[in-house]
């Protein structure tokens, strides 16, 4: 009897962050194949690490940082820029009569997240996200992203020159000639990563994010409907029928109105 857990199934084995949140410099977290629990008091960095995972293994267009906080109706105040900059303190500026933030990394800099996966049967891949900011970068749309999917185990240490030189795609291809995928946007990269990991449906990623970040799962029936049951094709047919009926009803009303107007003059 083998002690290997789910051989052939890719599982996260290592999380790396570089200049992410208050984790300054390089930090590496080894993840047990049997399962991993992140716990600690408020402000210890739990959500920071989970959010790091979701920047790569996340659902494009539906991402929320610090979802556990926003779930309770609060605004998390976290986004890609605050994580890269290392926001750590809010202060009231008496002179400006405004709230200002303190950052660990205010100037031009780069951040990185790395996820290493192993199938425990010899297969290994690494997914990397490099994020470059200029001194003037203040919004997420201004962050220059580079997503890399590579065979084997690759460290963010190997990406330092890429990060320092604005994460050029040509430089990345030259440094890593065996690239599996390279993209500027999460959506196509996520599709390539899911294919490699054997995840057929994007809904599985949404469910992963939900279970990772939720303080409570709430209504189990609703959870099943939203994340585990595909929407039947009949829903689309019903929507189309309703839309066509509305158009037909409008056209009929127009004809009736025109006919009534013509009868007035008879």
Question: Which residues fall in each region the model found?
Answer:
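Extended, charged alpha-helical "arm/stalk" segments used for dimerization and assembly
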Residues: 36, 54, 119-259
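Conserved small/polar residues in nucleotide/adenosyl-binding loops
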Residues: 264-266
């Amino acid at each position: 009897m083998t002690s290997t857990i789910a051989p052939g199934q890719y599982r996260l084995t290592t999380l790396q962050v570089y200049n992410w949140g208050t984790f300054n410099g390089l930090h590496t977290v080894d993840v047990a194949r049997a399962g991993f629990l992140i716990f600690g008091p408020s402000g210890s960095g739990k959500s920071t690490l989970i959010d790091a995972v979701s920047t790569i293994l996340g659902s494009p267009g539906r991402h929320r940082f610090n979802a556990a906080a926003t779930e309770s109706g609060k605004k998390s105040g976290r986004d890609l820029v605050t994580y890269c900059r290392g926001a750590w303190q809010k202060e009231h500026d008496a002179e400006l009569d405004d709230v200002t933030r303190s950052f660990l990394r205010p100037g031009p800099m780069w951040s990185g997240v790395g996820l290493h996966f192993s199938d425990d049967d010899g297969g290994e891949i690494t997914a990397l996200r490099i994020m470059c900011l200029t001194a003037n970068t203040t919004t997420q749309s201004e962050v220059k992203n580079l997503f890399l999917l590579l065979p084997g185990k690759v460290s963010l240490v190997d990406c330092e020159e890429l990060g320092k030189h604005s994460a050029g795609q040509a430089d990345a291809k030259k440094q890593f000639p065996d690239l599996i995928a390279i993209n500027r946007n999460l959506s196509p990269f996520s599709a390539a990563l899911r294919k490699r990991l054997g995840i057929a449906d994007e809904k599985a990623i949404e469910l992963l994010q939900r279970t990772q970040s939720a303080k409570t799962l709430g209504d189990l029936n609703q959870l099943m409907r939203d994340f585990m049951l595909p929407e039947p094709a009949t829903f689309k047919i019903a929507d189309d029928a309703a839309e066509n009926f509305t158009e037909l009803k409008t056209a009929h009303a127009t004809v009736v109105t025109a006919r009534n107007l013509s009868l007035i003059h008879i």
